[in-house]
Amino acid sequence: MSCLNLIKSVIVLIFLVPVLSYANQSQNVPYYGDDFYQDLKTGTSNIQLRERLKRIFNSVHQVRANGNDVIGPKGCKGECYQHTPTGYTAARVFLMGNFYLVKNGREYSVHDVYCDKDLSREDFKGAPPAPGRIPDNRVINVEHTWPQSRFTKRYSDEMQKSDLHHLFPTDSQLNSIRGNKIFGEVTQDLIDLKCSASRFGVGSAGSEEVFEPPQDHKGNVARALFYFAVRYEMEIDPQEEAVLRKWHREDPIDQEERVRNEEIFKAQKTRNPFIDFPELVERIANF
């Protein structure tokens, strides 16, 4: 092997090691417990899989050294945890004052996922982006990917409103335009939006108005809605679901989405299984 080829091989190995380490870790996440992994082996699907995930979401978890969590133990001993809502204010700080905050020298900007751009101090008349702060909501706000008007009564509004897995920072105007419309692929624009990354108009399946996010956010939207439907025992509109399944395939999970899932777990102690195990989408026939 030439010296140049050897150097190239070493460089490739350096970049592959962390990726492979993460891939191995994601295949054995203690959060899900032993029974879940048995379900994976036996091909559990549909209602049974949803019920398994619901139990994982709703139960107390007991941490087990060098093993998977004990799900719903009788009398928890040692280190235990369960889904703990952060509250909506803390959720907004997490997103816009932390995870999506970008440092540029001495200045900060915050990433808007609907226009797919970073908004800096110059874009704000009020409070600008800064660590641990919520910037001017007339410029950027938090989008509830599952609209608040469609929340279930089975769980508290506050739990659903502050669940970080379906929250993203978006341009306030586009947030308002999207409203509670379903997601879809636009065939005829009804409004010229301020940025071309997103579209609003007539959907490909008919006359219903739909909102179409940027290409590199479509898979994120799909997996957020799959999570929310299972977590809170709700159903996704069939027309919307067909598009979401397509987006899940076309915009696969990237490193940022994996890191976000980890950080959300640290903050509220729940994970999105459709990020950890994207193949689960194919095991559920109807969301």
Regions found by a protein language model. Name each.
Residues 10-18:
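Bacterial N-terminal signal peptides
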Residues 21-118, 280-287:
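N-terminal module-boundary/linker segments of secreted carbohydrate-active enzymes
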Residues 108-112, 117-139:
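Short, His- and charge-rich active-site/binding loops that engage polyanionic ligands
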